[in-house]
Amino acid sequence: MNTVAIVIPCRNEEKYIGKCLDSIINCTYDKNKLNVYVCDGKSTDGTIQIIESYSQKHAFIHLLINERQSTPFALNLGLKADNSDMKIILGAHAEIYPDYIENCIKAFEFEDNLGCVGGIIENVYENDVAEIIGKAMSSGFGVGNAHFRTGKTDGLVDTVAFGAYKKEVFDKIGYFDEELIRNQDDEFNFRLIKNGFKIYLYRDIRSKYYVRGSFSKLYKQYYQYGYWKVYVNKKHQTVTTIRQIIPFLFVCYLFGGIVLSLLSKKMLFLFMIVFLLYWVVAYISASKLSPSINIRLKVVKTFFILHYSYGLGYLIGIWDFFVLRKSIKKEESLSR
């Protein structure tokens, strides 16, 4: 495995794209064996100009225009532009460590039939809200068993962030589903595993990620995750992961419990007991992340945003895709 391609989808990332590209330039891997494809979705800020300036100085950095302005189309645009042995998916908000590529190559030797490897994300907080969100997303209570955020050991997993893929994976199972606004990476990894490949988490594969500091954007993001997960399930006629069901059940409990509580005092009592238990467990989980009571309470609030938004999106997705049998369309309200 010698040649490597890095694909970066982006749009309006003038604040971050330079840092991302600098981290790649500072990598110790032989640049003669590396190509970087930044797939820009017609940015309206200075992102394109920044990418062009880098590409003029470094022959291995290339700008591609993502005409459809969708993430999966951008990914496929970059992946199909290159025939390298290994292809890495990277985010514009990310920076990789100097030995990132070497450790990806090394990790492929740990198990037979590995199709993808990845590592641990280290959060970089730009403000207090970003730090709260980052803490919540580093908790198993917040995001389930997303090992690239919470994992403490190397081993097989069902998904990773900023994964490196063998070329043969794309040759066998195809590319990212361009119908999906969200969850295209989860859907792709599901197909990868279904076709006999494995995904490996190696903690020495390290990257930094600049966490967005907005509760409203977090809500929208996780609503979309839940909504589009239903479409993925319908398409493959299976529930791709068990952990996705829990926020959905939580939202059903909230709505159902409120209605039943209006009909019976016993149901109201039961509803309040279980609801109180949720907050107790949430606070205990938050207490492991910070000694500050104020920060703990904000993390608990973030837990609720994560669970409620994902669960509500999942519920609406079931209604749209299974009950109303809606077909896919590019809804602007659900795009990034």
Predicted regions and their residues:
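Cell-envelope/extracellular polymer assembly enzymes that use nucleotide-activated donors
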Residues: 2-5, 35, 187
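Short, acidic, metal-binding catalytic loop of nucleotide-sugar glycosyltransferases
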Residues: 23-33
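A conserved acidic beta->alpha catalytic loop
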Residues: 40-49, 94
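Glycine-rich, basic loop-to-helix element that forms the pyrophosphate-binding segment
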Residues: 66-82, 103, 157-160
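Short aromatic/hydrophobic "clamp" motif used to bind/position activated sugar donors
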Residues: 87
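Short, flexible, basic/aromatic active-site loop/helix in glycosyltransferases
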Residues: 119-125, 134-156, 160-162, 171, ...
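Catalytic donor/gating beta->alpha subdomain of glycosyltransferases that bind UDP-sugars
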Residues: 171, 177-240
